[in-house]
Amino acid sequence: IYGDPKREYGEKAVTKIVEQWGINMDKVTLYDGSGLSRTNRMTPLFLASVLRSAALDWQTGDLFPTLLPRCGVDGTVRNLLKGTCLSGNIALKSGSMTGVRCYAGYYPAERPRYSVVLLTNNFHCTYEQLKSSIERLMVGMFESYQDTIDKRQNTPQL
């Protein structure tokens, strides 16, 4: 949007798009627009609103959700939810730095119905313990919905 790849241009570009979507930025601090700085601050509600708006936007709606890797299948989430009912059925972008692990994306991956955002800060366990807790949480949240989808797909249509 602004030409040269400078930090302040990334922040301006993200702010411009988010404001066009009418998303409240009161509790948000964007430093670089990429999410790579510890100075960035945002809430799960803000991220969920961005995901929802991107999925509903006529210019990005059909494309944007397909750009995210599928858990248990590819990208940095290829080992997350592997072997569960959500493997391949939830698309998430991961982000991490020391003491921080975040996931944001869509469920189901095909024709998204829900924005999914999970931010963890200052955790005091191993990554494997955190991953196990995150997997139990996500499976618990979406397992009954996934069962409903599976039953519909296996029911003969009249």
Report each predicted region and the residues it spans.
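A small/polar active-site loop signature that marks catalytic segments
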Residues: 1-58, 62
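Short, Gly/Ser/Thr-enriched beta-strand-loop segments that form substrate-interacting elements
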Residues: 79-110
